[in-house]
UniProtKB/Swiss-Prot annotation:
Residues annotated as binding NADP(+): 44, 158-159, 180, 258-266, 273-281
Tissues expressed in: Mostly expressed in root tissues, observed in mesocotyl and embryonic roots, seedling roots, crown and seedling leafes, mature bracts, anthers, pistil, caryopsis and embryos.
Alphabetically ordered keywords of this record: Iron, NADP, Oxidoreductase
Biological function: Catalyzes the reduction of a 3''-keto intermediate during the biosynthesis of 2'-deoxymugineic acid (DMA) from L-Met. Involved in the formation of phytosiderophores (MAs) belonging to the mugineic acid family and required to acquire iron.
UniProt-annotated binding residues for substrate: 112
EC class name: oxidoreductase
GO molecular function, one term: aldose reductase (NADPH) activity
Family recorded in the similarity comment: Belongs to the aldo/keto reductase family.
Induction (free text): Up-regulated under iron-deficient conditions in root and shoot tissues.
Gene: DMAS1-A
Pathways per UniProt: Siderophore biosynthesis
Domain of life: Eukaryota
Protein name stated in the entry: Deoxymugineic acid synthase 1-A
Matching InterPro entries: AKR, AKR4A/B, Aldo/ket_reductase_CS, NADP_OxRdtase_dom, NADP_OxRdtase_dom_sf
Length: 314
């Protein structure tokens, strides 16, 4: 699975994530430059991550140095934050993202969560007063306008359930290209993957290794005994087994490491396949969602429970 391996729609199958705890512009810029040198071409960011500007700086520097021939050789994904998930704020939000990136377009623009907040509310913790009802139709019509204006080559969503996708598809004139969600061997998303495949929506996996080390992540994936046993028997790392498994599901995936050796390891999962028996063993791993999105739930807000946020799909 090289970094240049792409879906039928031209999206690289593997991308580098840039969500970090607190702004770290220079380390991000250096890491993205190093990743480009290693071979990554897809970079995943978001307004909420505050990493758009250093990614743009790294991309411009890579073009100047000849590491890539032009910006067109890179695939940039960014996301609409909840406080801009309002009809009249979507296009301006993307224009601000493009200013941050110093680019004329993004390759993919996603609705970050099916959640709306009052304009200006950016950082957790959130209160019930921060949330307002999510007008999916209005937000999506504005996303479609982003595409028509040429500001986003493709549009999609993140953290959408089957039910929410069904609702979106009932009125969308431009269907979502991608649904970016948590996918890993501990949260395999079989139902959602089957639904998306049937609707022509590409599933993109975030936290394929369980997001160990983040404020919401877990050791459950990397510490899974089945994965450790498969890795040992195949002479691979647990990370490589996880990424190979996601890849063999047909999903795109977003991995995050600023360490060059790990960057290379995360790309080095070609030349072997998991056996049917290994797939069977992985399928039997007890399932539990890691990123529950609890911060978007409030007894006085639009989503009063996790069941409502995920439409029972947890």
């Amino acid at each position: 699975m090289g970094a240049g391996d792409k879906t039928a729609a031209g999206m690289p199958r593997i991308g580098m994530g840039t969500a970090v705890q607190g702004p770290k512009p220079d380390p991000i810029r250096r890491a993205v430059l190093r990743a480009i040198e290693v071979g990554y071409r897809h970079f995943d960011t978001a307004a909420h991550y505050e990493t758009e500007a250093p990614i743009g700086e790294a991309a411009a520097e890579a073009v100047r140095s000849g590491a890539v021939a032009s910006r067109d050789d890179l695939f940039i994904t960014s996301k609409l934050w909840c406080s801009d998930a309002h009809r009249d704020r979507v296009v301006p939000a993307l224009r601000q993202t493009l200013r941050n990136l110093q680019m004329e377009y993004v390759d993919l623009y996603l609705v970050h969560w099916p959640v709306s907040m009052k304009p200006g509310r950016f950082k957790a913790p959130f209160t019930a007063e921060d949330f307002v009802p999510f007008d999916m139709r209005a937000v999506w019509e504005a996303m479609e306008e982003c595409h028509r204006l040429g500001l986003a080559k493709a549009i999609g969503v993140a953290n959408f359930s089957c039910k929410k996708l069904e609702t979106l598809l009932s009125f969308a004139t431009i269907p979502p290209t991608v649904n970016q969600v948590e996918v890993n061997p501990v949260w395999q998303q079989r139902k959602l993957r089957e639904f998306c495949r049937g609707k022509g929506i590409q599933l993109c996996a975030y936290s394929p290794l369980g997001a160990k080390g983040t404020h919401w992540g877990s050791d459950a994936v990397m510490d899974a005994g089945v994965l450790q046993e498969i890795a040992a028997s195949r002479g691979k790392s647990v990370a490589q087994v996880c990424l190979r498994w996601v890849y063999e599901q047909g999903d795109c995936l977003i991995v995050k490491s600023f360490d060059e050796a790990r960057m290379r390891e995360n790309l080095d999962v070609d030349g072997w396949e998991l056996t049917e028996e290994e797939h069977r063993r992985i399928a039997e791993i007890p399932q539990r969602k890691i990123n529950l999105g609890k911060r978007y739930v409030s007894e006085h807000g639009p989503y009063k429970s996790l069941e409502e946020l995920w439409d029972g799909e947890i």
